[in-house]
Amino acid sequence: MSHLLLIDDDLELCDLLSRWLSQEGFVVAASHDGQQARQQLQANSPDAVILDVMLPDGSGLELLKQLRQEHPELPVLMLSARGEPLDRILGLELGADDYLAKPCDPRELTARLRAVLRRSQATGKPQLQDLGDLSFSAARGTVSIGEHEASLTLSEGRILEALLQTPGEPVDKQALAQLALGRKLSLYDRSLDMHVSNLRKKLGPHADGRPRIQALRGRGYLYQP
């Protein structure tokens, strides 16, 4: 049974989502501001977090940034009532695994949660993948290049894992989205592109200046060995 932490100052929505998700088999704890959320995170270890962009004592984006520093592999799904593209972009740039606009269909929220939890609980991943100067540990969620080590989010790790399986060969964007996000991309959905952009920043270029991850128009992405 998966444990969720729902962070939202909308008490009515929290109650509705908590009851719905409980009926769907989740154990739900709710926090209504950033301070409560930090206390809950210290006291418990949720399997995933649902986080609202707007909180009464600060930005949910700031809390997300802290979450990513302290719990890089913890799945985080963001909610926003503002519907601003900038919120979505910032959330994904800061490492949210997925993003939904409010009001959202509880069934879609449940499906997104199950997808991200399946990815986080996936078994059979190789413990270590080495390619040139890069070493990726799926178990630890870290990538090392020389002396530099970076922590990856769940989505970033799944993207890198898929690209390293076929170095030098493109992976179709829809196939990569299914592996990394657990769903297909909809029209104008740039979630995958944002995760790849974050991953590129963490990896940096090769010593000769070549990008490690290359985008091929109409074909997807590839890792350049």
Each language-model region and where it sits:
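Active-site beta3 strand of CheY-like receiver
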Residues: N44-I50, L55
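Short hydrophobic/Thr-rich beta-strand motif most characteristic of the beta2 strand and flanking loop
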Residues: G25-G34, Q40
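Basic, amphipathic DNA-recognition helix from helix-turn-helix-like DNA-binding domains
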Residues: S59, K65-D130
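Conserved acidic carboxylate
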Residues: D8, H32, L55
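His-Asp phosphorelay/catalytic-motif detector in bacterial-type signaling
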Residues: S45-D47, H71-P75, S186
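Charged docking surfaces used in two-component/phosphorelay signaling
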Residues: E12-Q23
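DNA-binding patch around the recognition helix
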Residues: T123-L128, S151, M194-P225
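Short, Lys/Arg-enriched segments at the junction into DNA-binding effector domains
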Residues: S2-H3, R114-Q174
